[in-house]
Amino acid sequence: MMVWEFIDDVGELMNDTGTRTILDLTGKTITTYILFEVHDALADCCEGDRVEAITDAVTAIDNDLHAWSRTTGNSLVEVSEHGTTRRYVIAKSAPKHSEHKLAGIISDDGLFELLSPLGFALGAALEGHDVSLYFQGPAVRVLATGFRARMHGLGRPFSRFPRDGLAKVGHIPPQDKLRQLQHLGASLFACGPSMEHYKVDPANLAFSNVTIAAYLTFMEQMSSADIHLVA
């Protein structure tokens, strides 16, 4: 009989063969947040090691975790429901090479307008696809040190309230998502003329390894990509 024992308060479970990392992700409904935490935990594991993720029992989360498992090859060896929560046991598999590439163009720096393009980019990167993002127009401000996403229009002064609500469910700030993307190997590009127009100083970027260019440089990325995203 397998005997499990909690060995500390930070989420590790021990049996007679080693440890299993446990991630309590209840309250988070954004699957890119959930899967980035799972990805990070698996990165420290050997092939065959397991990570346990506890989430809310939400259909969208369940479908996305199964899609991620099919794409990456990491196995969902056990899924069980317990009231309002669902427990996923994930076994790390050998890395699965992806032939897909996403090239995305982002033109808007609004709080809600950034959610979808960054979400799809993160989803692609978490599935192991090559990701390149080009920021143009007002979106170049997203790359500047100190940027905080705000709503457009009359709601702009009250942006803190939806921003806090989004963060609570897993929509972390845009710059944090970009750091996750770079951690996953994504490449960032910025439109040089837009940076000049919106007074974004290249010396004041919040990210390293940003390629400052214009249309033709990013056309190289788009021509080799099979997934295109324009937002």
Whereabouts are the PLM-identified features?
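A charged, amphipathic interaction segment
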Residues: 174-230
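A glycine-rich helix N-cap at a beta->alpha junction
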Residues: 72-80, 151-182
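Short, glycine-rich nucleotide/cofactor-binding loops
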Residues: 25-32, 103-115
